[in-house]
Amino acid sequence: MAENRGNLTSYRPDIKVMDCTLRDGGLVNNFEFTDEFVKDLYEANVAAGIDYMEFGYKADKDIFDEKEFGKWKFCKEEDIRAIVGENDTPLKISVMADVGRTNMKRDIPPKSESVVDMVRVATYINTIPAAIEMANYCSDMGYEVTVNIMAISTAGENELDLALELLASQSKAQYIYLVDSYGSLYPEQVRRLADKYIKIAEKYGKSVGIHAQD
């Protein structure tokens, strides 16, 4: 992996790009997007050559009232298929599953029954064991899997080191994400953290993703 590193001007075809407009934007409007907007966004991502499109969350309907949120809070299989059909395109479909807020055994079917390609597991530093369990379950179901550790700007150095070691060594996730949840990290901090993540990820044959804020 080290030979693939570059700088801001390097050509990096190995880097994959994910559009999170629906999932992240839905936090602002309670996921009340029209089907027309979602379809247009999907087609724009396909035309632009985007690698992944994240549709929203796999939220537990026992915790969140479906009457209070749009459909992309829950990402039912039939709703995604109404937009993408069989998704006969190079674009891959992603959903996010929050630790403690997703009923994985009820709401995440085997990949053979779903048009979704990737599940991104969102966790905080204090729920790493549950994140490992969810990541391994989703991997066993046939999905590509990431684990995103939220709010790392508030985590201590030692607990972050332990969390990364546990995730990298015990989870079946292919990717571990560096997430700046609050937009509070400066470039030099991101570089230092990225080096930390990459060092541990490479040790266990995993890759690193980043979700930044402006």
Where are these regions (language model features)?
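Conserved, mostly hydrophobic/aromatic
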Residues: 25, 45, 119, 176
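Glycine-rich anion/phosphate-binding loops
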Residues: 30-40, 123-130
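Conserved C-terminal portion of the radical SAM core fold
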Residues: 163-181, 203-204
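Catalytic alpha/beta core domains of metabolic enzymes, predominantly
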Residues: 179-214
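N-terminal small/glycine-rich loop or linker at the start of catalytic domains
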Residues: 4-30, 90, 114, 144-150, ...
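Active-site glycine- and acidic-residue-rich loops that bind
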Residues: 32-35, 149-159, 184-188, 211-214
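Active-site beta->alpha loop and helix N-cap motifs at the rims of alpha/beta catalytic domains
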Residues: 46, 52, 57-166
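Short amphipathic alpha-helices and their capping/turn segments at secondary-structure boundaries
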Residues: 1-9, 38-47, 164-165
